[in-house]
């Protein structure tokens, strides 16, 4: 990358990643990944980081994640379980503390609502609802808007709007998050919008931000003649001047 850090990947005979090493100067940080298929057809993927912390993911024969477990340092396990409908849509996440989140879909299998609940009282399977998000789409099934609500008993308060825009190819050209109760105007959306630009081949060439982050106003992407990403440059804003700085570069073998 731009700081001359090198990331190396290793693979098994099934082209699955088994190791990731990142060299930063004289320090190398490595993660190892292992896979175990049980007699029931389920696969357990274990990721061990440089500190010895282990995360496990169990997937079924359909490739759907049934559970994830953070083993941490071995003293406490934190597990999240997942369930699905007959179409493979995730319909519930259940957390280690007993809280859970539900997912609803329309006839097109588009996500239209999520609801979050606290753990139920002793002997009760349904907890108190705390959050709700609803999603809307255009005629091409592209996500146009999501609205987040905070729930307190029977009272719902709008807390966030997320807006999306697309070009004729269906590529995202605008994304905006607005934390407010009232529906945003077009000007408010524009003021908070991240914008995405593409070349004639549909490759992302630039991302511009409504506000600077660490001085970066935009990111530009460069490609080689084969269409492979070779460089990411940051447009750094300082006082009245703007300069470009390479933040990451990529090389490929033959």
What are the roles of these predicted feature ranges?
Residues 1-254:
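Beta-strand elements of repeat-based all-beta scaffolds
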């Amino acid at each position: 990358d731009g700081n001359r850090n090198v990331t190396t990947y290793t693979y098994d005979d099934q082209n699955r990643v088994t190791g990731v090493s990142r060299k930063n100067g004289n320090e190398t940080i490595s993660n190892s990944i292992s896979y175990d298929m049980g007699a029931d057809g389920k696969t357990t993927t274990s990721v061990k980081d440089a500190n010895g912390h282990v995360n496990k993911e169990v997937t079924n024969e359909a490739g759907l994640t049934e559970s994830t477990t953070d083993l941490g340092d071995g003293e406490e396990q934190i597990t999240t379980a997942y369930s699905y409908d007959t179409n493979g849509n995730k319909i519930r996440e259940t957390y280690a503390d007993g809280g859970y989140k539900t997912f609803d879909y329309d006839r097109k299998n588009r996500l239209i609502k999520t609801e979050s609940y606290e753990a139920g009282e002793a002997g009760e399977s349904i907890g108190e609802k705390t959050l709700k998000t609803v999603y809307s789409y255009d005629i091409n099934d592209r996500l146009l808007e999501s609205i987040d609500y905070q729930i307190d008993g029977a009272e719902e308060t709008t807390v966030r709007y997320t807006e999306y825009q697309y070009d004729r190819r269906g590529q995202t050209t605008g994304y905006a998050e607005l934390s407010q109760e009232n529906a945003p105007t077009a000007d408010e959306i524009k003021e908070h919008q991240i914008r995405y630009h593409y070349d004639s081949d549909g490759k992302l060439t630039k991302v511009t931000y409504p506000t600077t982050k660490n001085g970066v106003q935009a990111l530009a992407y460069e490609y080689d003649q084969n269409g492979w990403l070779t460089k990411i440059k940051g447009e750094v804003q300082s006082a009245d001047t703007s300069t470009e700085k390479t933040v990451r570069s990529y090389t490929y073998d033959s």
